Swiss-Prot record:
Source organism of the structure: Macaca fascicularis
Phosphotyrosine modified-residue sites: Y314, Y493
Protein name (Swiss-Prot/TrEMBL): Heat shock protein HSP 90-alpha
Biological process per Gene Ontology, one example term: telomere maintenance via telomerase
Region (Interaction with FNIP2 and TSC1): 285-621
Length: 733
């Protein structure tokens, strides 16, 4: 490979050299890379090899429709050439190359969208190894190089050289060196303390670690010495050449020459007499070794691949530092042929549900040729955490994004991928420990799938895990719940809320827990959306215990008692409804309360208190929806509670008792809070509570206080009793 080794000494003739300034953000990024200490500088080689691979992908892709593009060089490969004498490491590829405009734009004057984002990430403590994800991997060369020269030849342009020592500017000139044919050569002039990257062992280690599955041969060229047995004539020629090199050392040069001549004659005589006489000399040669002989892993038989190999491939594919959690390797044959390798990561990325960010988690190949890596049509959004490759035999190689959207083949591939992902999750669920890790990270995705994917809703519902009133610290499946249901239980009961403790202590679950009925605790906001779509499981309806019309398993005697209570408290319910007016739709006797005097439930198709809270938190909420979805509140009273019984007696004794009205409003507002709703006017409620505290402490309401401001506040407080003009209770909305 003489052309690669010679080009480090480019002849600097009088050709025109143009100087350009780096775009501000790029200059800033380079300064950051050069002036900050990073321990894992080795990633520069991964990034440059990755860029070479992309360039080779491009020329291969173009050659599929126009084979003449490869006339400038049929072989597609990457060569690595370390040169210890010149302290340079050269990366050569026979990819698409760059035109002069490409050189100027791509390497310096036009900032990539990721430049700023990467700098912000770096300053926030991100790892330098993430550089490739932001599209600025080339600049990682300056981690180890003081100067970088890029020589490139594109089919449509002349050969150009780009050079920069990162001082805020770079030069571009026509290159008059060795013609390349086509491709790009990146020459790194290494810093004095970075010569380890010229060592054969170190280069092999980095390529194996980061670039083992690159689809093109990566060949390392190393100059080595070996012993060679030669006859004395050849040895003499070799010695003569060495003498010429050492002409500066002239001391006693004549004597050895005379001796040599004599010895030569003697040797010739000996040689004629004894031809077996040989001599060993050191010979330099260039050793070529292909570093990535492993073929694309997804084309191999899954039975022949070890978990370590899958792990290595996963890391090279995703740049993840952790191993994958689970893997699915399969091929589909028949009318449609494709192979796929899918991985579940150990943890969810921090921006998993950022819609604006295009995910590039599944790479699409067609007959081993890379096509694209952010193909949104390949997998539904709720599975956007799955990483891997899909290699199709049937898609056309020159397929565009628009064609992909219409492609029936892609729809079939997508359907198969979803099916296999669900199989993978079901297999994972058999390993309790690993499934727990998976569920912690990706439960939201499963629930989003239930909301969005009606076809696979049943399978996805089997993957759900929840805490329940009977499960303690373990999460259980809906199937587990069904196996523990009581004989006469027809429904699956659930409650939604913010935390496990909050829902466990809720008034709504009192009677269910007393009767030994298990209640599912749904404590993630997405659960509200999930149960809107998941109406039933294995023929059992899912019923919210916070909504009206709760049916509990009860015998005839219990039903009779309940009817009697309804009749007894019918009058109180009517009085309370008249006092609360439009605040509630109706007041009824409850069958769900044990220790609480009352609670607020919502209509069957309205929002729960938790959903109302979630919707109020939406910045872009639709207030018209809020109006009709959140308005339907029902007050349920506990007929067995002493407060309610005393209130009934008080109301029946005197229908116009003002304290009844005050107490009903106080009960309603307290029930709102305990049922998870928010108060429209918390201050008035607070004043009412302070007044109750005063009564409890025996402080007379009319006592003048030392502080005038306190007196003013006291005057504003609504009295517990009084006529229509003075009672503020009536004004509370």
């Amino acid at each position: 490979m003489p052309e690669e080794t010679q080009t480090q000494d480019q002849p600097m003739e009088e050709e025109e050299v143009e100087t350009f300034a780096f775009q501000a953000e790029i200059a800033q990024l380079m300064s950051l890379i050069i002036n900050t200490f990073y321990s894992n500088k080795e990633i520069f080689l991964r990034e440059l090899i990755s860029n070479s691979s992309d360039a080779l992908d491009k020329i291969r892709y173009e050659s599929l429709t126009d084979p003449s593009k490869l006339d400038s060089g049929k072989e597609l490969h990457i060569n690595l050439i370390p040169n210890k004498q010149d302290r340079t490491l050269t990366i050569v590829d026979t990819g698409i190359g760059m035109t002069k405009a490409d050189l100027i734009n791509n390497l310096g004057t036009i900032a990539k969208s990721g430049t700023k984002a990467f700098m912000e990430a770096l300053q926030a403590g991100a790892d330098i190894s993430m550089i490739g994800q932001f599209g600025v991997g080339f600049y990682s060369a300056y981690l180890v190089a003081e100067k970088v020269t890029v020589i490139t030849k594109h089919n449509d342009d002349e050969q150009y050289a780009w050079e920069s020592s990162a001082g805020g500017s770079f030069t571009v000139r026509t290159d008059t060196g060795e013609p390349m044919g086509r491709g790009t050569k990146v020459i790194l002039h290494l810093k004095e303390d970075q010569t380890e990257y010229l060592e054969e062992r170190r280069i092999k280690e980095i390529v194996k670690k980061h670039s083992q599955f690159i689809g093109y041969p990566i060949t390392l060229f190393v100059e080595k010495e070996r012993d060679k047995e030669v006859s004395d004539d050849e040895a003499e020629e070799k010695e003569d050449k060495e003498e010429e090199k050492e002409k500066e050392e002239k001391e006693s040069e004549d004597k050895p020459e005379i001796e040599d001549v004599g010895s030569d004659e003697e040797e010739e005589e000996k040689k004629d007499g004894d031809k077996k006489k040989k001599k060993k000399i050191k010979e330099k040669y260039i050793d070529q070794e292909e570093l990535n002989k492993t073929k694309p892993i997804w084309t191999r038989n899954p039975d022949d691949i070890t978990n370590e190999e899958y792990g290595e491939f996963y890391k090279s594919l995703t740049n993840d530092w952790e191993d994958h959690l689970a893997v699915k390797h399969f091929s589909v044959e028949g009318q449609l042929e494709f192979r796929a390798l899918l991985f579940v990561p150990r943890r969810a990325p921090f921006d998993l549900f950022e819609n604006r960010k295009k995910k590039n988690n599944i790479k699409l190949y067609v007959r081993r040729v890379f096509i694209m890596d952010n193909c949104e049509e390949l997998i539904p959004e709720y599975l956007n955490f799955i990483r891997g490759v899909v290699d199709s035999e049937d898609l056309p190689l020159n397929i565009s994004r628009e064609m992909l959207q219409q492609s029936k083949i892609l729809k079939v591939i997508r359907k198969n991928l979803v099916k296999k992902c669900l199989e993978l999750f079901t297999e994972l669920a058999e390993d309790k420990e690993n499934y727990k890790k998976f569920y912690e990270q990706f439960s939201k995705n499963i629930k989003l799938g239930i909301h969005e994917d009606s076809q696979n809703r049943k399978k996805l519902s089997e993957l759900l895990r929840y805490y329940t009133s009977a499960s303690g610290d373990e999460m259980v499946s809906l199937k587990d719940y069904c196996t523990r249901m009581k004989e006469n239980q027809k429904h699956i009961y659930y409650i939604t809320g913010e935390t496990k403790d909050q829902v466990a202590n809720s008034a709504f679950v009192e009677r269910l827990r007393k009767h030994g009925l298990e209640v599912i605790y749904m404590i993630e906001p997405i659960d509200e959306y999930c149960v809107q779509q998941l109406k039933e499981f294995e023929g059992k309806t899912l019923v919210s215990v916070t909504k009206e019309g709760l049916e509990l398993p009860e015998d005839e005697e219990e039903k009779k008692k309940q009817e009697e209570k309804k009749t007894k408290f019918e009058n109180l319910c009517k009085i309370m409804k008249d006092i609360l007016e439009k605040k509630v739709e109706k007041v009824v006797v409850s069958n769900r309360l044990v220790t609480s005097p009352c609670c607020i439930v919502t209509s069957t198709y309205g929002w729960t208190a938790n959903m109302e809270r979630i919707m109020k938190a939406q910045a872009l909420r639709d207030n018209s929806t809020m109006g009709y979805m959140a308005a339907k509140k029902h007050l349920e009273i506990n007929p067995d509670h002493s407060i309610i019984e005393t209130l009934r007696q008080k109301a029946e004794a005197d229908k116009n008792d003002k304290s009844v009205k005050d107490l009903v409003i106080l009960l309603y507002e307290t029930a709102l809070l305990s049922s998870g709703f928010s108060l429209e006017d918390p201050q008035t409620h607070a004043n009412r509570i302070y007044r109750m505290i005063k009564l409890g402490l025996g402080i007379d309401e009319d006592d003048p206080t030392a502080d005038d401001t306190s007196a003013a506040v006291t005057e504003e407080m609504p009295p517990l009793e009084g006529d229509d003009d003075t009672s503020r209770m009536e004004e509370v909305d």
